[in-house]
Amino acid sequence: MFLLPRFILVSCIIGSLGFDNPPTNVVSHLNGDWFLFGDSRSDCNHVVNTNPRNYSYMDLNPALCDSGKISSKAGNSIFRSFHFTDFYNYTGEGQQIIFYEGVNFTPYHAFKCTTSGSNDIWMQNKGLFYTQVYKNMAVYRSLTFVNVPYVYNGSAQSTALCKSGSLVLNNPAYIAREANFGDYYYKVEADFYLSGCDEYIVPLCIFNGKFLSNTKYYDDSQYYFNKDTGVIYGLNSTETITTGFDFNCHYLVLPSGNYLAISNELLLTVPTKAICLNKRKDFTPVQVVHSRWNNARQSDNMTAVACQPPYCYFRNSTTNYVGVYDINHGDAGFTSILSGLLYDSPCFSQQGVFRYNNVSSVWPLYPYGRCPTAADINTPDVPICVYDPLPLILLGILLGVAVIIIVVLLLYFMVENGTRL
């Protein structure tokens, strides 16, 4: 009976030998209520249509292809679909949201609105866009695209002013100048409508600089007016530069309603597409995997800039992307990161995903889920099951009392026996 506490302690020490619970560099999920947004590296349909069907093209394990939890499109991204004619209707829903896309709009594509524009501005736009997407998908279950209907009472049509290579901007739309206007010093309006979603992410953009047309310089000025609430959202050009500027966008989160787009100078812009956010949920951080090229192409870090705790966990490989299918598809490091989608995990943190919820040598930063208690389990003389000192102290006291009782009893019986002899 008195050996039981000692037996428990010895069993605890033996059971803890060699155990560790470090954070792992993967994306995972607490349960089956998750969803992934991606590109060709997780586009199972694209692989099915290749000949032969070579799944080494993907970083995603093909066992997940029939899960119904993936919305991916080769050659595309959510940002690219949001702004340009090259469109894919990303649609998905889950408590735990994972993003592995963005590489299809990088400095490698060198997009800018005009020949004297700036791709740096578009990288800034990308970062601001994904910031809004990640923040809002931490509190919404559902993401999809919706068209935004608008009514312009003039005779002018939308124009493809902003284009580069194969990319043509169509969100927001530019309304061309009316034929009876001699310059761009005029005010013009258009109605647009948001309905059917809890909230929407829409673009509000201006050329932030002196826009030259026919020897005249113009300052862009754009506003959205909510006719139901009276709230005004606006941007005015503040820069005096005449080259090296581009289309600066802010990404507004708006409620349903009737809106008026207003231009006080230069061309009127009006949103044509929106991210539709639906089904509020309890706060659940999103997970983002860095979407980048092999080093032979220039990538950016805008998804990393956008993904900040506590609303987002960022995962990245420590090595260059080197694919096995081709140089940009099928990298072992990123395949390892996505392998966490094959199983449930109890705890997520800034450092990584914890496979167990008992103890770890690393204290989870910005933890979410059922997370372990930190303890120094790298010290070989200290078992992980004694990370809390109070049970150890109590156990020591009990062992001491047991030893004293045993000694007293032995002395008592020895004396008793000696007396009888």
From Swiss-Prot:
- Give the UniProt entry's GO cellular component terms: host cell plasma membrane; membrane; viral envelope; virion membrane
**How does it get modified after it is made?**
N-glycosylated in the host RER.
The disulfides recorded in the entry are C44-C65, C113-C162, C197-C276, C205-C249, C307-C312, C347-C371
Its main localization is virion
Q: What does this protein do?
A: Structural protein that makes short spikes at the surface of the virus. Contains receptor binding and receptor-destroying activities. Mediates de-O-acetylation of N-acetyl-4-O-acetylneuraminic acid, which is probably the receptor determinant recognized by the virus on the surface of erythrocytes and susceptible cells. This receptor-destroying activity is important for virus release as it probably helps preventing self-aggregation and ensures the efficient spread of the progeny virus from cell to cell.
Q: How does it assemble?
A: Homodimer; disulfide-linked. Forms a complex with the M protein in the pre-Golgi. Associates then with S-M complex to form a ternary complex S-M-HE.
What protein am I looking at?
Hemagglutinin-esterase
Chain's gene name: HE
